């Protein structure tokens, strides 16, 4: 009898242990929301392509970095040289078209992200040209990081140094490809102005630069362990300089300090493709679960506390309003106002959330 009781107790304990992961997957409440119909007003005969990047500045202006086609291709030696496959548009806070920035810029090839820093400078990340470019608020190029392949073979440079418009390049900081991007994906800044780039599709790492764009360090490699990545795709930094990296190939968000030391990870957010973080004394994290190849019906966006607790979700995959066609970019400067850039539907939606007030709301 004692043996039987012991066996039953062991089975019960095993069942409880096996149930723990499932118990952690609590139901996520739906957040009511609306989508402003046709918010962005495009001029006649100008169209958005894949809305790879979306960002807002302190005035509420919206910037969209979009894959519009029309690229120029030059074959030279063993390399293919391409440019002008993307465009950067600006809209005012009402959605009215303002201008195109950087028309036919050498760096514009295959758009991946646009972000606006605390000084309202506009930064684009281009996966095709392997370049990160900074524009001032007037739309003039003031910095580019990395070097684009030439159309003909040339010797590798001794260093990949940033170049500021109107001034000399920064001092050499290293040699060879170690300092070169390979299909970068996103950019963020800490409180000191240090620059962080997810060097994602090719190198599976995060690179850190000082505020003058001088290389500081890199961390990460291809893999599944903490601190490794499978296509780091989006990056944001909170007011305490914690660094959040979307790691969609590993179905997680990883959190680091600003020196690259791993702190924790969130694994209950599907396939996180895009992140944004709100301003203010109480910050929130938004993450898009964007069309996991194993479940194309996924497509919702999560609202989270910075400790990983999910407050709710909204939307689903689809082509109608309030549905999402592979969200590739998020902006949430205002807590319950989210801009979502979509790939398959060629659009940006302005989303207004109506969450119930909770004890964590401030």
Regions found by a protein language model. Give the residues of each.
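Positively charged n-region of N-terminal signal peptides that target proteins for export
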Residues: 1-4
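Bacterial N-terminal signal peptides
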Residues: 6-16
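Eukaryotic scaffold repeat domains enriched in small/polar residues
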Residues: 23-362
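Cleavable N-terminal signal peptides
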Residues: 11, 21-22
